[in-house]
Amino acid sequence: MKNAIVIGAGIGGLAAALRLRHQGYSVTIFEKNDYAGGKLHAIEKDGYRFDLGPSLFTLPHLVENLFALFPEEIIDFGYKSKAISFHYFWDDGTLFKASTDSSQFIEDASKVFKEEKSTIKKYLAKSKSKYELTKSLFLEKSLHKATTYFSLDTVKAIVHAPFLGLNNTLNDENSKFKNPKLTQLFNRYATYNGSSPYQTPGIMTMIPHLELGLGTYYPDGGMHRISQSLFELAQKVGVKFRFRESVTNITTSKNKVTGVETKNGSYLSDLVVSNMDIVPTYRNLMKDVPAPEKTLSQERSSSALIFYWGIDREFPELDLHNILFSEDYKTEFEHIFEHKTLAQDPTVYINITSKESSNDAPAGHENWFVMINAPGDYGQDWEQLVEESKKQIIAKIKKCLHVDISKHITTEYILTPQGIEKNTSSYRGALYGAASNNKFAAFLRHPNFNGKIKNLYHVGGSVHPGGGIPLCLLSAQITADLIQKEQ
């Protein structure tokens, strides 16, 4: 039986390990932490449970596909669909509840934003078309293999290239709405890959289709159950885990991978899959291999500053996902990407899993995951930024919800870009690897194979096709397919 080593037990590493196990490999995962899941982790504090990382669940079939590889194994994993994706709030009192039923969304958006139904319907139809035209090429195949470009999917994408909006920004595409609030709502989808709507290409108008066309979901027991259920499955099917054992070097001979080294010794392997961020993979584990500097020096995606608050009352006007919009969205993104700091009036995201899982907070209380988009760590004074941002967030909540939330916070845990990098090795704390702030970004991400070292592969949010749960799972699928063809 051939051996495979996976570096990192994030969602991409777990998925890659399961797919390789299904191919017949003996698989060992090395993980520096004492838990599996990477960013998909959770903590409990003073009677509250908090999911630390990704909070939005879309494309659940990508998780189900992994369970389907091992139908004889029964894992407790369920989820439910959400009728409302987000509650959106503005300072002037405007509230919009975004239905995941497109017809209802069109009806409600037309009423709230005074926009023509036909305009919204056309936009959503275009979003769906872009997604269906590009998903096979951009999300399900390697963009770095010549064979990809001789497929029918590629021909379709090329024929429809003018329709995809590659030469416009997302904001250009969305400014066709008369109401700037609706433009802002759709501009927010740039943050799903850690980018600015004023720079990322118009093709990103396909992202709303994931929510408004294909639906949003909530896993029973919280987002942490996604990573935990895959961890449980991996254990059941014989994947071995070595926790608290950091890989210090990827070993090679004659430009071919031979295994890895850790503080505990050397391990031989027929192939290695790195789920570590691509920058520290080269900088720390491949010091003798010339690094692809152009790839590694790309602008990093946004990070996040997150406050986890136990709240001593309930807010019926809030749902699982809530957005309190900035009054100056463009300035907010300029601060993040150009000035590497935080705006005075940030957009605030509040995720409350106790709305779905009552055990996540004491009776009559709620667990608030309160996040603002942030730049990565470039040596800023995070202690000061945390202090200032907390005041600004409290002020934003007061404007939109008419309550001084500071009087209701019973416990607090804070995660900064520095903390994200420390916990997950994500370079500068970037949540999605490289930003997608230009039309070539998809092609400039590091491939899922290594061009210099044979039998070395890469998965996760810093490589193709990108960050977020669905794309990390797809990166594992692409990589496993490459391995099956090449080995």
Curated annotation (Swiss-Prot):
One of its GO terms (biological process) is carotenoid biosynthetic process. FAD binds at G12, E31, K39, S55, L56, V247, N275, L431, G461, G468, I469. One of its GO terms (molecular function) is nucleotide binding. Pathway: Carotenoid biosynthesis. Keywords: Carotenoid biosynthesis, FAD, Flavoprotein, Nucleotide-binding, Oxidoreductase. Its EC number is 1.3.99.27. InterPro entries: Amino_oxidase, Carotenoid/retinoid_OxRdtase, FAD/NAD-bd_sf, hydcarot_desat_CrtD. It catalyses: rhodopin + A = (3E)-3,4-didehydrorhodopin + AH2; 1'-hydroxy-gamma-carotene + A = 1'-hydroxytorulene + AH2; 1-hydroxy-all-trans-1,2-dihydro-neurosporene + A = demethylspheroidene + AH2; 1,1'-dihydroxy-1,1',2,2'-tetrahydroneurosporene + A = 1'-hydroxy-demethylspheroidene + AH2. It is an enzyme of class 1 (oxidoreductase). Pfam families: Amino_oxidase. Belongs to the carotenoid/retinoid oxidoreductase family. Can also use 1-hydroxy-all-trans-1,2-dihydro-neurosporene, 1,1'-dihydroxy-1,1',2,2'-tetrahydroneurosporene and 1,1'-dihydroxy-1,1',2,2'-tetrahydrolycopene. Probably involved in the synthesis of myxol, a gamma-carotene derivative. May use FAD as a proton acceptor. Monomer. This is 1-hydroxycarotenoid 3,4-desaturase.
